[in-house]
A protein has these predicted regions:
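Bacterial Sec-dependent N-terminal signal peptides
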Residues: 1-43
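Conserved Rossmann-like nucleotide-binding pocket used by diverse enzymes
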Residues: 27, 245, 269
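A non-transmembrane, solvent-exposed segment enriched in polar/low-complexity residues
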Residues: 31-177
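Short, small/polar residue-rich loop motifs at catalytic or cofactor-binding pockets
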Residues: 63-64, 243, 267
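N-terminal targeting signals for export/organelle localization
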Residues: 85, 98, 119, 161, ...
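Conserved hydrophobic/aromatic pocket- or pore-lining residues that grip, position, or stack substrates
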Residues: 195, 247, 271
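N-terminal "domain-start" segment that seeds a small globular fold
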Residues: 226-264
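Conserved redox-active cysteine motifs that mediate thiol-disulfide chemistry
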Residues: 267-275
Length: 275
């Protein structure tokens, strides 16, 4: 009787051990399946199975290949994992004709479409935000292209040409405004940071100062952001209404003199610089 109970108990323990091992194995597999990563799927208009698509980075206006995918059954797929969000390009070229779209490489499912009239990357937060801005810009570009083509009509009167030029200028302002609004809406994410670094010079000092204060801590030491901070601080220091910056120079006879030696001594101080 005792032997039977011992044997039964031993078999039960073995079953529990097997179940525990199986549970651990399933847990490991589950963790591996849940590991953060990206899957990029897309199509290219006019491409054939066997053609090559690349993920590339752009450095000093030059493309550098980072990954390769072969088109199969009309689609291409990239898989990998990112520990940070970066701007990259998906490119395709054949017989001298190429098409590309820049996007934000980040973990998640990203869908890409490359065609003559539609270049898009969507599916993740940063790419959706970027595509929203791109759609607005593309619409403006199309209107500008139509005006540019219409300007070639030799039958247009001077008044009609002036009207077209005015419309074109208004679209340029709309383009800048679309970028500005995109930056303001996304300044706390990689999309807004990238566009801000590209367009800050079009902003007022006040606008740049306000945007810089909203940039997340992990971007505060970015090389370009640091430069923009420096430029903005210098602009603030020399803005109208600010106290003058004192400096010292030598007179023609070699005597050192400061601006403060003259400011406040009369009604007006004129400082003339020449090279």
């Amino acid at each position: 009787m005792h032997k039977y109970l011992f044997t039964k108990h031993t078999k039960a323990m073995k079953k529990l051990t097997y179940l525990a091992v199986a549970a651990v194995a399933l847990g490991v597999a589950s963790c591996n399946n849940n590991k953060p990563g990206y899957v990029i799927t897309g199509t290219v208009e006019g491409a054939a199975d066997g053609d090559t698509v690349f993920i590339q980075e752009r450095v000093n206006r030059q493309f550098n290949k980072l990954d390769t995918a072969i088109i199969a059954n009309g689609t291409f797929t990239f898989e990998g994992a990112q520990d940070s969000v970066v701007n990259r390009y998906i490119t395709y070229s054949k017989d001298g004709d190429g098409v590309y779209v820049d996007f934000f490489l980040e973990n998640g499912k990203i869908k890409v479409n490359l065609s003559k009239d539609d270049k898009s990357a969507t599916g993740t937060p940063n790419n959706d935000a970027y595509q929203e801005i791109r759609n607005k810009i593309n619409a403006i570009d199309q209107k500008q292209a139509a005006i540019y083509q219409a300007m070639g009509d030799s039958t247009l009167t001077d008044d009609q040409k002036m009207a077209k030029q005015k419309e074109f200028s208004e679209l340029e302002e709309a383009y800048s405004q679309a970028i500005k609004e995109g930056v303001q809406k996304n300044i706390t994410n990689p999309v807004g940071i990238m566009l801000f670094k590209q367009s800050f010079y079009e902003n007022s000092t006040e606008d740049n100062d306000a945007l810089l204060k909203q940039i997340p801590a992990n971007y505060q030491n970015d090389e370009t952001i640091v430069k923009i901070k420096d430029i903005t601080e210098k602009q603030k220091a020399t803005a109208a209404g600010q106290k003058f910056i004192d400096f010292e120079m030598l007179t023609p006879d070699g005597k050192p003199v400061k601006l403060s030696d003259y400011v406040g001594k009369g009604k007006v101080v004129l400082v003339d610089f020449w090279a």
